Amino acid sequence: PSIHMDVICSKLLQNIQFRNYFIDRYADLINTIWQQPRVVATGNSMTNEVAPWIPRHHTRWSGDMTTFNNTMTNMFNWNNNRIPGARNVVQSQFALTGQVTYTLDVQPAGAGRIHISTIEPSEVEYPWNGVYFKGVPVRITAVANPGYTFDHWSPNSLFASNNYSQDLNITPTVNAAFTAWFEG
């Protein structure tokens, strides 16, 4: 079965649209659910769920809370240290030339949101930073909240004057900040 999956994945990745989606989605997941604060919060939540049973487990199978807590800390550290390596594997595997950091912001605060690739960072996270791969197109869309309308994007290193298109299709080459301005 594994050999068939390898063939299927290999063929899918030959399709440039699928390849780009795969790479962008991978970046989106690293930029969101695999970030250290979320992993720690999820791990702590799960730890709190099982905490009442840990002493009983240790009585039966040996161990202690110090070892348990050290194991959790090691898991969190492994995740945090894994992120740069995971990005480098994608960059190497697909022969990409580098990574860029995009900063997204909304003005005025609370007037809208920004959708990037397959995610929409929470309003409480603005300004938001995410790492994407050079040469792989990324779609960025400004979305107005009720009572507001999109006005423009602030100039940045990728375009010199205000950009009035709500949707941007960017092929990353350099770090850039994207600030969506809304009126309302």
Protein language model regions, located:
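Extracellular modular ligand-binding repeats in secreted and cell-surface proteins
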Residues: A111-R113, S117-Y148, P172
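Middle-to-C-terminal accessory/interaction subdomains
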Residues: P1-T103
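Surface-exposed interfaces of beta-sheet-rich extracellular modules
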Residues: H58, P137-N163
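Conserved "repeat-terminator" motif of extracellular CCP/Sushi domains
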Residues: Y164-G184
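Intrinsic-disorder/low-complexity, polar/charged segments enriched in Ser/Thr/Lys/Arg/Asp/Glu/Gln
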Residues: Q99-T101, P137-R139, N175-A177
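A short, amphipathic beta-strand motif
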Residues: V100-I116, A180
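Hydrophobic residues in beta-strands and at strand termini
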Residues: L104-V106, A144, P172, F182
